[in-house]
Amino acid sequence: TNGSGIEQDGYHGENISREGDIVFCSINHRLGPIGFSDLSGVGGEAYKDSGNVGMLDIIAALRWVHDNIANFGGDPGNVTVMGQSGGGSKVCTVAAMPAAKGLIHRAVALSGSTIGASDQQMTRKVGEYILREAGLTASQLDKLQRIPWREYLDIADRACKKCWEDQGISMRRTFGPVADDRNIPAGVFYSGESHLESPVVPMIFCTTFHEWNPNRADATLEKITQDGVVEKLRSQYGDKAESIVKAFAKSFPDKTPVELWAMILSSRQRVVEAANAKLKQGQPVYVAWFGWCPPLFNNRMRAFHCSDI
């Protein structure tokens, strides 16, 4: 699965299927406000799962795989779930969901990871803003179902922006998996009592060397100096920028300044955190770094985000 609505040939699975004895199955799930509008605060019991219907779509798909994949030559007792980018984070989330126990047996998170879902106090606040922006009261909540999807997305977008302006809530995590402690445990994934029912499976975490390559759209940055990279990073790292660049240059002496810049922007801190958390379950955990650079634009693209697909 991927975490967005994009379509690429790489997601079709044909090439993966050619490489070994596997049955490849891609899935769909609801995204954004359609899949993750938490209305449980205003809708009560009837809307208790509303903040996670996108993840529940994935669980439903995995149940279908469990019940039907043998008809296609697959093994329901040997299911690997794999996702890339936002889909990698979704894989981490699925691996923390009690409902996935027995449905998945291995997991692979590519160029995306997480160790926790969004705080429900925050997501419920966004739900209140959605209702207000739609001009509805709590007793009229069911009318949201009749709003055309395009109109609803616009309503949710406006509500999200107003909530950010009023509450300072990050728009990036507004519409994503919710730690409702019902479908998705609260706290750090794979740890604590609330995660005792989560799947305990081996997992691979992988990122690319140059996830966020600053010179993809600007060839002139190929000639940037190490001092130039330091200056570019000062707004983000302040006085530590110089020591960070020097540390990367020492560890990777064969890399050019622009490559070092890309690698710093592509920090693996969250991946390491997720892998260490998963390791506590006692199953094998592997961390990989994808470095193959496709011969595109005079090799300027390097190992960019999505190239691992």
Where are these regions (language model features)?
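Alpha/beta-hydrolase-fold catalytic nucleophile elbow
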Residues: 28, 82, 97, 106-111, ...
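Substrate-access "cap/lid" subdomains that shape
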Residues: 67, 101, 110-228, 259-276, ...
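Alpha/beta-hydrolase fold nucleophile elbow
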Residues: 65, 72-85
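Cap/lid segment of the alpha/beta-hydrolase catalytic domain
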Residues: 1-59, 63-71
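Short glycine-enriched nucleophile-adjacent loop
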Residues: 88-100
